[in-house]
């Protein structure tokens, strides 16, 4: 999701531009949250058979509200036609993931019945190998010798209880990745936000594009999203990581990126996104241009139009995609909501495992911090109408 290889590029080459601060940095200002990326994260973690994903989202909102941040949640509208290929790839990936989970589940059931085949056993062992190699790479530490997968296919006649549990966990994780929220789930989320007094908006098109446009127009100070397309959408500040436990965030300032890359204007960030590959043109990777090369080319040639010897300019679709990164919307109506306990109780009746205590904290802090903000603004305000957008 987003610009290919860019997060790693920034962290490795320009790590000093990944700022780590407390979320209270944005106290008394408005931030827009691209909900889609967080929904995907929570559903993959918890699935959607319970309300744990919903409780996690309420906890995320609480992190902002209790620190005095005015949060507005943005829901996706209609995706542009240019994103059809990317959406198809996601559907295909979910289908392959489901097939993989089903095959593993069948092999585990065969093991428990004593009918497992050699092929099924090898498949399970390989899954263990791959998962351990992945964990080792993430943790940067050596595996315990007993976990070594070298020669496992021939030397492991059976699977230990611990390995079986590990495999079951892998299957559950894969199954969660295949799940998707229903229309009722989305309605329940909107009802929770409304009940707790958290403002939400339906984007005309994509949430991240609309959120970035709102920030560029001065309606807020930052976009909160996991989608690196926000860099090409040129929001002033993009918060990519939020730790709900500590309130710590990691963000980038797009002007600082421009300065570090020695680019002349923010429009070059659009061409940067097109060159490395974004959600609108996944086929652009045929040119095999990574972030390092993209920065060098734009620094030298200023624009895609001036770059010589590109392997296949047609796959870039740069003229069309530039327009998608420069959307125009009508002036928004951002409505401040008042908490509604009746709506919360109605939702609780449908979802018995909804964390009512967490929702209550969200309402309490929303009311308290909003009152403090209003009093503070009334006492010190000398700003004009444009500044009141915040």
Model-derived segments and spans:
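Intrinsically disordered, low-complexity regions enriched in proline, serine, glycine
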Residues: 42, 83-84, 233-234, 285, ...
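Beta-strand elements of modular eukaryotic interaction domains
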Residues: 21, 61-62, 229, 284
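Short amphipathic alpha-helical interaction elements and helix-loop-helix interfaces
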Residues: 67, 195, 199, 217-220, ...
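Non-catalytic nucleic-acid-binding/docking modules located in mid-to-C-terminal regions
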Residues: 16-27, 134, 149, 255-390
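Long, highly charged, low-complexity intrinsically disordered interaction regions
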Residues: 215-284
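N-terminal donor/sugar-recognition subdomains of glycan-related enzymes
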Residues: 10-11, 18
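Noncatalytic, basic helical substrate-engagement surface that gates or grips nucleic-acid strands
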Residues: 2-5, 12-13, 26-204, 210-214, ...
